[in-house]
Amino acid sequence: MNRNITRIVDGIQTSDGAGVKLKRIIGSPELNLLDPFLLFDEFGSDNPEDYIAGFPPHPHRGFETITYMLNGKFRHKDSAGNEGFLSDGSVQWMTAGRGVIHSEMPEKTDGKVRGFQLWLNLPKKLKMIEPSYNDIQSGEIPSIELENGKVKIISGKFNGVKGPGIPHTGM
């Protein structure tokens, strides 16, 4: 299947949490009506001052967040008693459901911190489910070599290979 690119939208530079610099791609005024995709951010810097303040405790409700760490380290804690640790190539899958307060705090590293976070809106019937949390380590994520690159399957199925992510949205 071939598709044409009809428009290119640049993300906007902004900050979130306690001043973490990031680029918001979905969720900006240019691109904000893509339900179930609520938000898509790229974060990354070589300068610890751009990210070290992290994302102190804050609430979420009614959606899932999927964080993919390309480089760096983040520590997760939440009000449901979950704790996790993200490092190079790992994924954090958090379902906020009826509500959770959590923090994502970076740990200083010698190199660059870089990653992506996607927010997926939960269907109405699932908005009040129990919060859940899952760390997926890089070694648990299968990949497929293609002619022009490599595909990592975090969730769903591609070419007969199933990813370890368990979404509530069907994505």
Q: Where are the predicted features?
A:
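Ligand-binding loop in jelly-roll beta-barrel domains
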Residues: G97-L126
